Amino acid sequence: MATTEYADATTAEDVERGIEGLRRRHPVESAVDEVLSRKRRRRGHDVHNSRSLEEIGKGLNAFLARRLDDPFRVRDLARMPGGASKEQFSFELEWTDQGATRHDQMVLRMNPPASVVETHRVREFQLLRAFDGIVPVPFAYWATQDDAELGEPAMICGLSRGVAAPTKGERTASGIGTVYGPELRTKLAPQFVGHLAAIHTLDPSTVALDAFQVPAVGTTQGVDWQLGRWDRAWEEDSFEPHPTVTLTRQWLWDNRPAIDRISVVHGDYRNGNFLFDEDTSEITAILDWELGYLGDRHHDLAYAMLGAWGHLDDAGRFVCSGIVDAETFIADYERLSGLAVDPERLRYYTVLNMYWAVTACSATGARIAEDRMTHLDVMMNFMGGLGASLIPELNRAITEGA
């Protein structure tokens, strides 16, 4: 059973009481509350039923007709492989933009009834728009959080060219443990670090991010919202308590660092979440902004350095995200960003990242698979094992130096 007293509620009144209880115990940003509450209301009622391309196309045409004044045509609509949370479809749009006829390759990203992480399409849209021209990102065309438009919240963005992993190498699930090789690493590393520095040094007040709440500098507000998010997910989705998770949650609350500078946090910055051109070795797109928020830059740094994403090189050094060794990563980041990296904050966010990964993989993934609310049942079973593998690392991390 899940740990919340309302996890198995069946009446609408019980569900709403449960949501109110979760809100009181675990305050989060309003947009995050919106998507978490939406998932809870649908549990036990909605299951994932794969819709035909004809149905998707009908909804897509109606969606575009509400936004485009001139005639348009959708061509070559197809399901896309990959991804660990959203359904994706590629298509070509023939349309008129500012008087010129265009033929653009686009991607429709749609929520299933529930995901391993619940995220807000308008937030993702705003981040892509904010970083257009600053780092390589797909262009964001339109987004909606209204189920009535396409059946689920959705976003349409440009189709970026490139590959997530070398085509001659072994493909891995969601990019985990991607191996690029020494020559390619040398070319990718400066870009990987440089783009992260550019993300963190953008002043959030200069771009349109009204779907985000801004934490106050000198407080723990930003990390409080993150802990609230993952505590709420664990309480709602886990099947039984786990002593390591209980200890980790307490450690995280007891050791919260106050934020010294507000940065845009990508939230999922690692190998597998960017594309590159195999001929030029140029990073062509940074993807998967859905977990982005305004907070502490150390969150992204610690995440890119997690053991699950990297491997040892021939000299026995750990290669962060399969791209760059930790010492070079930190030194180059500090040089390019002008921002200091605090080892204690890095340790804290390493623990937080492992905690949310355990929650998403071992609790939410298993829960939505059981509830038949995802199109990725097999992937959710795989991710449960990944979450379990992080438990010993969490034990070591919270007892280190204690």
Language model regions located:
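Juxta-kinase regulatory segment immediately upstream of eukaryotic protein kinase catalytic domains
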Residues: Y6-R73
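ATP-binding pocket architecture of kinase catalytic cores
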Residues: R75-L247, W251, R256-R261, E278-T280
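Conserved protein kinase catalytic-loop anchor
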Residues: I262-V264, T284
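Catalytic-loop of the protein kinase fold
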Residues: V264-H266, N271
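Hydrophobic residue at the +6 position relative to the catalytic HRD Asp in the kinase catalytic loop
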Residues: F274-F276
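Activation of the activation-loop gatekeeper triad in protein kinase-fold domains
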Residues: L287-G292
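Active-site activation/catalytic loop segments of kinase-like enzymes and analogous catalytic loops
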Residues: H299-G338, L352-D371
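All-alpha amphipathic helical-bundle segments outside canonical DNA-binding/catalytic cores
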Residues: A340-L352
